[in-house]
Structures are given as structure tokens and as C-alpha cells.
């Protein structure tokens, strides 16, 4: 019988996966009370900094602290490169799809997607019809939600193009991990993410036909 979930840290025989071994040794050597204390410190620091989130659909707008998990999601570089290429390919396809919908609508004419499914959708913007965008770049940012089945195969749960939230939480969570657990980063080669704001700026600039446009993020 196939496994109903994928254990990121241990394989089916209960053996620690190679890319988690260093972390497993650190975790085994760290007293539980020390982990609990650092978790409380993280909650306090997030609270003081006002780093919270609101659940969609919550009419009261109740703000909640970011759930801080000391167990990291560790992905080997070779595995991540495959995921990265797949995400890039997917976002390119989605931009081509949007460019077609707002221009020739070949995908509708070919009967692949019913016209009413697009034209009657509340997110369809009739004012965008026929409007040419520089480099046909409709989605500058994509929040691709990934899941894994019991065998460890990655699947895309959904593509968040309209409201791709979560990047700021990722950046703040990494800062918190580096502040509370610097020894983990000293022992392993962890890919940096602090250059994300520069990547975002470059992406937004590239969507303009001007050489050096002003960029405002609302």
C-alpha cells in the first residue's frame, strides 16, 4: 500500500535522509526546553515587529502571529533545480495563456476552454482586451503552492497570480531562524534569499519599455 504522506526527514525504513542528517544531530543534542524558549522568543519578536497575517474571509480582520516552525523544510539543491525549472516553465505558460485571452483567444476558438468560463469570470478585465503589454508580462509574481504525494512527487496545488502573498513571511522567517539558530546556518550551505527585493525590482523594471523607470509597490 502506498504511503499516504511523504516524510521529508525520514524514509520509509525510518532512516534519516542525507540532507537532514546534520539537522537531526543538532536537534537530538538540543534540550527541548531550549527549543521551547527559542520558539517563545520568536513569537515575542514577531509580535513586537507587528508581523502578522489575517485569514481570508475573516470579517473581523483578526490578526494572527506567523506560525513559527523550528523544523525547516530542507530541499537538496539538485532537487530544487528541478522544481525551479518547472515553476519557471509554468509561469511562462500562464503568461502566454493570459496574452492569448486578451488578444486572439485562440484557446477559446479551438474549443479547449469554453468562452463563458473566461468571459463570464469576475476576474476577467474587459478593459485589458487588445492592450499590448511590454514583453507580454501579465503576472510579475507567482505564488505557486506545492504539495508532495506519498512517493515524494511534487504537484502544483494552485497558482496564485492575483494575490501572491507570503514572500514577506518567508523573508522574516529566515531572519528569525538566522537570529535564533545561527549554528544551523554555520554548519550547512543554505541558499540565500535576501536578494529577493532586488529580483523583484529588476522584474518590475523589465516590464516597462523605459530604460530606468520609477517603480512603486503599493
Regions found by a protein language model. Give the residues of each.
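Preference for protein termini
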Residues: 1-218
